[in-house]
């Protein structure tokens, strides 16, 4: 559901007012700008407050310093300092206009000016080009409030110029559209596609931050279909998915549309509360289908080994985008196991939990539930005949909850014996061998070959 503007829902926080008033008392002009204004108009939670001012950054530092407000020089080449009031940072920037962008990311030069409207004109989108003052009200030279009400992401001025200045804005437009549930305005959309090649000049880490931001909105399903060409530039592995006919009686859609539907379905099954790991896994779960595709003599398509290959490709994509290991590892594992057969039996539950525990220690239970949500979403995004499997997964989930509640064994610490028991029973010296024996015992218990009974496990070690 798209949010609608309703006037600034709450006042500027006291800590930010402290800095703003100090600048005005010294004879300078100051406004709150950026995301705080946009979100306040939408009635959404606001976080960081940014201020723009007619004061040169050196004057900002002097004025606030006289009020015993700490100021850090965080970007003085662009007129930016960061003040800290009551432990909260406030980014304060001098009114400026910008020169050319040779690297398509940063301006080659900036010129400080004394007109806030000129400063707003350099910003990316109309919804981010508004300024607010507690007494003077809203300054909106580019009709950002209208676009908030219409649900549009519109570039300030000439769209192509905005995107050629900073190619990362191409992805920022998609992220804002996803986050707010907006559409991209027509001329801005045309420029997005024309300028998407500029992402080649952007650091992969920055691209990764934006793609991750898109995924975390829960609207990657929409983005894959509405902004395909942009996402192909950001994640080239998406390209082969476009229009790829699966030639399968179980699939009604090409790989891209199937993936889009899976992304949407995980949001439905989780009430919009899917974890980042699940959202990324939904996005990349079938990334290897185009490279593993084969056809049999009847023309039917097969994708043998695509979960395993997809796990490697998922890791490659996410590492290339410099995403953190604690996100990469669970996504890789979810992709690898998304076709793994899970039955509503204690043994199947324990084996699944063991796989996740081995790959992502301490996260097995939450990832097992994420796997079931992924499987549900996958099932309902195929042919209608496959939707019944989603109902079966409900039974598997109930079994998983029962097994976890019963204190099932799937971690080394769940075993009834410890490393010292291994040393005493076998005479082995402390070292890696102890862990190997415990691992073998855990496997035997998980597979139902041995009960998790201390005496039985010790006897088993002595016999060996």
State each model region's role:
Residues 1-464:
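Catalytic cores of the polymerase beta-like nucleotidyltransferase superfamily
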């Amino acid at each position: 559901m798209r949010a609608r503007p309703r006037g600034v829902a709450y006042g500027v926080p006291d800590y930010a007012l402290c800095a703003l008033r100090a600048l005005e008392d010294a004879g300078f002009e100051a406004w709150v700008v950026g995301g705080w204004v946009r979100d306040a108009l939408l009635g959404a939670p606001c976080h960081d407050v940014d201020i723009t001012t007619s004061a040169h950054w050196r004057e900002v530092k002097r004025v606030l310093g006289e009020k015993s407000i700490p100021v850090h020089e965080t970007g003085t080449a662009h007129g930016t300092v960061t003040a800290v009031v009551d432990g909260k940072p406030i980014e304060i920037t001098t009114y400026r206009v910008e020169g050319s962008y040779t690297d398509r990311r940063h301006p080659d030069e900036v010129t400080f000016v004394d007109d806030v409207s000129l400063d707003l004109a350099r910003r990316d989108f109309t919804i981010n080009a508004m300024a607010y003052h507690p007494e003077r009200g809203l300054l909106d030279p580019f009709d950002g409030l209208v676009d908030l009400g219409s649900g549009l992401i519109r570039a300030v001025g000439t769209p192509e110029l905005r995107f050629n200045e900073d190619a990362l804005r191409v992805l920022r437009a998609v992220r804002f559209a996803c986050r707010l549930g907006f559409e991209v305005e027509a001329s801005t959309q045309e420029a997005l596609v024309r300028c998407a090649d500029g992402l080649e000049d952007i650091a992969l880490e920055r691209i990764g931050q934006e793609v991750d931001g898109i995924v975390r909105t829960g609207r990657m399903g929409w983005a894959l279909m509405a902004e395909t060409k942009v996402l192909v530039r950001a994640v080239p592995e998406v390209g082969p998915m476009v229009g790829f006919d699966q030639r399968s009686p179980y699939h009604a859609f090409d790989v891209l549309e199937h993936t889009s539907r899976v992304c949407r379905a995980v949001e439905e099954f989780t009430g919009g509360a899917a974890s980042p790991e699940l959202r990324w896994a939904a996005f990349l779960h079938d990334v290897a289908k185009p490279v593993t595709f084969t056809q049999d003599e009847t023309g039917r398509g097969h994708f043998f080994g695509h979960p395993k290959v997809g796990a490697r490709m998922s890791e490659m994509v996410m590492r290339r985008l410099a995403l953190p290991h604690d996100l990469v590892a669970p996504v890789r594992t979810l992709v690898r196991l998304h076709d793994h057969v899970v039955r509503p039996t204690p043994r199947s539950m324990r084996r699944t939990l063991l796989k996740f525990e081995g790959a992502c220690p301490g996260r097995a239970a939450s990832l097992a539930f994420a796997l079931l949500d992924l499987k549900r979403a996958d099932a309902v995004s195929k042919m209608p005949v496959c939707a019944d499997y989603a109902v079966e997964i409900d039974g598997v989930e109930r079994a998983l909850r029962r097994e976890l509640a019963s204190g099932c064994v799937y971690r080394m610490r769940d075993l009834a014996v410890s490393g010292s028991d291994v040393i005493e029973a076998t005479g082995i010296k402390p070292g890696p061998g102890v862990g190997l024996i415990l691992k073998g015992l855990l496997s035997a218990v998980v597979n139902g070959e041995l009960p998790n009974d201390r005496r039985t496990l010790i006897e088993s070690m002595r016999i060996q």
